[in-house]
Every structure is written in C-alpha cells, then in structure tokens.
C-alpha cells in the first residue's frame, strides 16, 4: 500500500486545502501528518515545540511519516518542514510527491496571523518566511515528482492539474500557462 500522492510545500502553499480536494477527487481519504502527530502526542505542534524542542518534534514527525507511507493509500499531506529530515527525504523515494510552490508574498499573506506555525511566530514573519524558503525549496525540489505553482490559482485548477499529472507521471518542472489556465 502506498499513498496516491504526497503533498509537500511551505506553510500557506495549500497542502490542507488541496489535500482535501484532491482526496475527494480521487475518492480516497486524506491523512495530514501534522494532525496525526497531534493525535499521537496528545498535544498541539506548538506545545511540542515549546516543551520538547524542534529536534524531538522532527523525530516524532519522521516516525509518523514513515508509518503513513506504508499504511496510507490515499492522499498524504506532510508538514512544511518534514523534508528537512534526511530520513523523511529518503522515505519519500519512489513515491509520487507533489510540491505546491508559493511565493514569499503569497505565503505570508495566506498564513496571516496564524499562531499554529511555531517557526513563523512573532515579528518579522516575512523575513522568517523567506528564510524557510531558502532552506526548504531545494529540498522540496529534490523530493518532488510533480511541481505546481499555487500562486494566484484557485484550488480547483491546482487539483485538476495534479490529477492530469497523476494520469501522466512524466517528470515535470512546472505547469505552463496553457496547461494551468493561469499566467505564471
């Protein structure tokens, strides 16, 4: 058993929204690893970060992701930082991994004043977001088999594009404006 698609991307890229819609379109369930971590730990991610630190959170996250890659056959949505773990990156080999791309400005706008993202908490959110981008974008690109730009695109268009790629899994760098129906 393996997921139909694994979604990765920065906070605000649409992993939860696209994940729900993609799962519905495929007729499968969605597993959000952040929610699974909270359920397993009995605490919020922010609490885990505050009490145990990021290193312990990443250890738990890798455990949850590895199990989900074996046990879940629907759509799997990973937390934005999951790819920072070499173990997670290794576990993603051979899976269909969809990287939801987003600009810094759009990511900051979409995440707004959210308190559920510990690495973006506090002042200078735009600067923190750009730092996450520089660290994580190369990792997302390394693990992805499908890339889709989510900037200024409605979720339905993103899901349709992903569905077309799942039907034709040839390597991809980014949708063209004609394939996506949106200017890039």
Swiss-Prot record:
Chain segments annotated as coiled-coil in the UniProt record: none
Keywords tagged on the record: Amino-acid biosynthesis, Aromatic amino acid biosynthesis, ATP-binding, Cytoplasm, Kinase, Magnesium, Metal-binding, Nucleotide-binding, Transferase
Cofactor annotation comment: Binds 1 Mg(2+) ion per subunit.
Pathway: Metabolic intermediate biosynthesis; chorismate biosynthesis; chorismate from D-erythrose 4-phosphate and phosphoenolpyruvate: step 5/7
Matching CDD domains: SK
MF term (GO), any: magnesium ion binding
A family per Pfam: SKI
EC number: 2.7.1.71
Function in brief: Catalyzes the specific phosphorylation of the 3-hydroxyl group of shikimic acid using ATP as a cosubstrate.
Protein name stated in the entry: Shikimate kinase
